[in-house]
A protein has these predicted regions:
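Two-component/phosphorelay signaling modules centered on CheY-like receiver
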Residues: 14-32
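Acidic catalytic/metal-coordinating carboxylates
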Residues: 35-39, 62-66
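Conserved phosphotransfer cores of two-component systems
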Residues: 45-47, 69-76, 94
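Active-site residues of response regulator receiver
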Residues: 55
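Receiver (REC) domain active-site loop signature in two-component systems and cognate sites
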Residues: 58
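C-terminal output helix
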Residues: 104-117, 121-130
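CheY-like receiver
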Residues: 120-164
Length: 164
């Protein structure tokens, strides 16, 4: 039996959550689900998660706030923020590693998931450095920069921003 990465999927729309779960399981991932930000933070802290796919617009706690709490406890775990919005203010994206509009094709989502999971294991030996970079992202998020990010899939790793 081979080991499979565990992905935490968070969305308040049951059909979206079930679709993500089926897609990821069909592609070799184990999946844990939550329907709001508070549930997500609890699941994140009590499980050894390898990646988080987090909806932005949710009741009780938006995705950016849930991501900030997650990064406080485990800064080396990559978090991808998903949204039906094509673009979000940069202050909402500072703490996450990747932004994926839900309108992007499924193959784009799977490519980003594969990439983020591989980065997680590639950079795992450098956890202290990643923790420092994540702490800087959390601080920047709390400061609230004013600029907007362009449309597309934005990825950030150790302070380097790429928009695909």
């Amino acid at each position: 039996m081979s080991w499979k990465p565990l992905i935490l999927c968070v969305d308040d729309t049951p059909s979206v959550l079930e679709g993500l779960k089926m897609l990821l399981e069909e592609n070799g991932y184990r999946v844990l689900t939550a329907t709001n930000g508070k549930e997500a933070v609890q699941a994140f802290t009590s499980h050894s998660v390898d990646l988080v796919l987090l909806d932005f617009h949710m009741p009780e706690m938006n995705g950016d706030m849930a991501a900030a709490r997650m990064k406080d406890s485990k800064p080396d775990v990559p978090i991808a923020l998903l949204s039906s919005d094509e673009c979000l203010p940069s202050r909402d994206l500072e703490v996450v590693d990747c932004f994926i509009p839900k309108s992007k094709p499924i193959v784009s989502l799977l490519e980003k998931v594969d990439y983020l999971v591989s980065l997680r294991f590639l950079f795992r030996p450098f956890g202290a450095l990643n923790a420092q970079a994540a702490a800087e992202r959390v601080s920047a998020h709390q400061a609230g920069p004013e600029s907007e990010r362009p449309n597309g899939i934005s990825m950030k790793k150790d302070g380097i921003q790429k928009t695909l």
